[in-house]
Amino acid sequence: MKAPFTSLAGFRAVFDALPQPDAAALEAATARNGQLTKPKGALGRLEGLAIWYAGWVGDGRPALERPQVAIFAGNHGIAARGVSAFPPEVTVQMVANYRAGGAAVNQLCKVAGASMTVTELDLDRPTLDFTQGPAMTEDELVAALAAGWEAVEDEADLLVVGEMGIGNTTAAAAIAAALFGGSAGEWTGRGSGVEGAALEGKTLVVAQGLERHAEALSDPVEVLRRLGGRELAAMAGAIARARVGRIPVILDGFICSAAAAVLHAIRPGALDHAVAGHVSAEGAHPAVLARLGKEPILELGMRLGEGTGAIVAINILRSAVACLSGMATFAEAGVAEG
């Protein structure tokens, strides 16, 4: 779907009338769940996940058949400040690895039966170092939001967004601090593995960015423009597109959650179509999920990003949907109810 906006005002307008889950499908799924051949609540959280999914896809007896994993890659001006354990050229190299099928995300997509798309966002033009000025111009932000929006496949019945961009945990930390308050140190973690003096330097970069843009940080769209990156903006655009199309979303780790938090800040409830696939080992991720009111499905100590934790959760959701839709009711099975 072509993005319905050509300006930041147009993007904001998307949130004026967001679709809600289908009430009839929710009612039907809830009723069916109560009639299945199991004790009430015996499948635990799987039951709630299946009903949530049914409401968003508008089917009381749904199927999960076309999950899409959309990866976005962008480069950051702040990478030149030594905030990552890897050089900026790794972004381009990892995109090539995705296309060759050699990354972890490729293997996990195969297991999950998910299609995978990779969108490169001006990799030859890093964003501006946000300690020196806004990371993106308004036009650059609109273009990145639109790229994310248009990357979502119309036929997808589940979306996972992932990212590649050296320096993007720094941008995510700055966004989280700007949206939720607190010091740079509370939100800045090891990312790709920095520690000691390098971690102190990374934290200082976040603090300098927050100070530089302090007067504009009450506007979540400006937070994204000034402190974010193209791939974070594209993830936000894709998640917004999914809401408009009532496509359920599984959120990934810290970076993805920070991008999604911008939408939550624009309008509370904007992430009702999303669940948290996992809680990552990046230290501030639990705090972001708590602010978003999201309970993670998995806790596996993962911190790779790229959508990987969310992809692992796809088969958990698929299992939930399969039980709701495939199990017999007591009446169908001729089993006496307890």
Swiss-Prot record:
It is an enzyme of class 2 (transferase). InterPro entries: Nict_dMeBzImd_PRibTrfase, Nict_dMeBzImd_PRibTrfase_bact, Nict_dMeBzImd_PRibTrfase_N, Nict_dMeBzImd_PRibTrfase_sf. Pathway: Nucleoside biosynthesis; alpha-ribazole biosynthesis; alpha-ribazole from 5,6-dimethylbenzimidazole: step 1/2. Its EC number is 2.4.2.21. It holds the Pfam family DBI_PRT. Gene3D superfamilies: 1.10.1610.10, 3.40.50.10210. One of its GO terms (molecular function) is nicotinate-nucleotide-dimethylbenzimidazole phosphoribosyltransferase activity. Keywords: Cobalamin biosynthesis, Glycosyltransferase, Transferase. GO terms for biological process: cobalamin biosynthetic process. It catalyses: 5,6-dimethylbenzimidazole + nicotinate beta-D-ribonucleotide = alpha-ribazole 5'-phosphate + nicotinate + H(+). CDD domains: DMB-PRT_CobT. Disulfide bonds: none annotated. PANTHER family: NICOTINATE-NUCLEOTIDE--DIMETHYLBENZIMIDAZOLE PHOSPHORIBOSYLTRANSFERASE. Catalyzes the synthesis of alpha-ribazole-5'-phosphate from nicotinate mononucleotide (NAMN) and 5,6-dimethylbenzimidazole (DMB). This is Nicotinate-nucleotide--dimethylbenzimidazole phosphoribosyltransferase. It comes from Cereibacter sphaeroides (strain ATCC 17025 / ATH 2.4.3) (Rhodobacter sphaeroides).
